[in-house]
From Swiss-Prot:
It is a peripheral membrane protein. GO terms for molecular function: metal ion binding; protein transporter activity. It is found in: Mitochondrion inner membrane. Mitochondrial intermembrane chaperone that participates in the import and insertion of some multi-pass transmembrane proteins into the mitochondrial inner membrane. Also required for the transfer of beta-barrel precursors from the TOM complex to the sorting and assembly machinery (SAM complex) of the outer membrane. Acts as a chaperone-like protein that protects the hydrophobic precursors from aggregation and guide them through the mitochondrial intermembrane space. This is Mitochondrial import inner membrane translocase subunit TIM13. It comes from Cryptococcus neoformans var. neoformans serotype D (strain JEC21 / ATCC MYA-565) (Filobasidiella neoformans). A motif (Twin CX3C motif) lies at residues 47-70.
Length: 99
């Protein structure tokens, strides 16, 4: 009988842990999507302002080239900042438990 009651007592805790993990993953995914949307909006805003000085019905080849280069540089800078941030957070988490 103890195994019957024992399995019932552990189940709600496991359900709660699973729900917390699922919620955490869902929030992380939503944040990643929001960050990607923000990055795309910033790229569009900044690169368009820089490269398209005289809007017309189509882009010139120089405007297309400028937009492509601007986007590439913006993405590379964002990637570098993201890697540095993740490394710093990982380092801080590694140091925090030892305090």
């Amino acid at each position: 009988m103890s195994s019957f009651f024992g399995s019932g007592a552990g189940s709600p805790s496991n359900d709660m842990t699973a729900r917390k993990e699922q919620m955490k993953q869902s929030i992380q995914q939503e944040l990643a999507i929001a960050n990607a949307q923000q990055l795309i909006n910033k790229i569009n805003e900044n690169c368009f302002a820089k490269c398209v000085t005289k809007p017309s019905t189509s882009l010139s080849s120089s405007q297309e080239s400028c937009l492509s280069q601007c986007m590439t540089l913006y993405m590379a800078a964002f990637d570098q900042v993201s890697r540095s941030y993740v490394a710093r957070i990982s380092k801080e988490r590694g140091v925090a438990p030892g305090l």
